[in-house]
């Protein structure tokens, strides 16, 4: 009898990033050498300018496949939060690897943008940002912060995830505070938090991320 195929492996990039992000590419290259295809999704849905969290979640769920398929989700920053909400809603997700996840995202965006910036965002309908994927100035509509505020009101910004989860978060991260990852992991036995001396991009910690993820996902990996 043919054994069932292993789970899909999906990578979810962060806000204003894209599927060609450094972490996504490096992880995909590493797992390709292990015989695993890590599919890097495009979460700029329906576009960066009109970015919608619900559209991001929908894109991931569509990529999971059929009813009997299973998936491992890697998520960076806002992609990490997206992965959490997909796992909360969809039993096909069997494990998460989260890199500096943007928990309490509405609160964190308010802190990053500041009250004057937030007021301008609401009044003009747009927030000026940097598109890291295309390396150019861009903007995102005010519907996004309204959507994230509503999301946080429903769940206090803390998704209810029951699957095994690995978090790698930098102690020097000034974009998504590590305190929220610590708080979220504290009361969840299935969550392992690894703290590293790094900032939000975690570029200096790629080797550590790969090592921790390999160990965490050992049940899903063939021996090298």
Regions found by a protein language model. Name each.
Residues 74-83:
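Gly/Ala-rich beta-loop-alpha elbow adjacent to hydrolase catalytic centers
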Residues 160-161, 167-169, 173:
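Short beta-strand/loop motif that positions the catalytic acidic residue
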């Amino acid at each position: 009898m043919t054994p069932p195929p292993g789970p899909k492996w999906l990578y979810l990039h962060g806000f204003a990033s894209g599927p060609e992000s450094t972490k996504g590419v490096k992880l995909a290259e590493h797992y390709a050498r292990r015989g695993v295809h890590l599919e890097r999704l495009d979460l700029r849905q329906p576009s960066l300018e009109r970015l919608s969290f619900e559209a991001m979640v929908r894109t991931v769920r569509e990529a999971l496949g059929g009813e009997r398929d299973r998936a491992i989700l890697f998520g960076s920053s806002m992609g990490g939060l997206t992965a959490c909400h997909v796992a909360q809603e969809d039993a096909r997700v069997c494990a998460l690897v989260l890199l500096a996840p943007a928990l309490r995202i509405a609160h964190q965006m308010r802190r990053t943008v500041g009250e004057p910036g937030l007021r301008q965002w609401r009044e003009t309908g747009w927030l000026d940002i940097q598109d890291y994927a295309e390396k150019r100035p861009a903007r995102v509509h005010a519907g996004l912060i309204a959507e994230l505020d509503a999301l946080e009101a429903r769940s206090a910004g803390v998704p209810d995830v029951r699957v095994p989860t690995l978090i790698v978060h930098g102690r020097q991260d000034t974009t998504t505070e590590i305190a929220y990852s610590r708080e979220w992991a504290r009361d969840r036995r299935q969550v392992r938090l690894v703290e590293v001396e790094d900032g939000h991009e975690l570029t200096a910690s790629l080797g550590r991320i790969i090592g921790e993820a390999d160990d965490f996902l050992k049940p899903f990996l063939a021996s090298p």
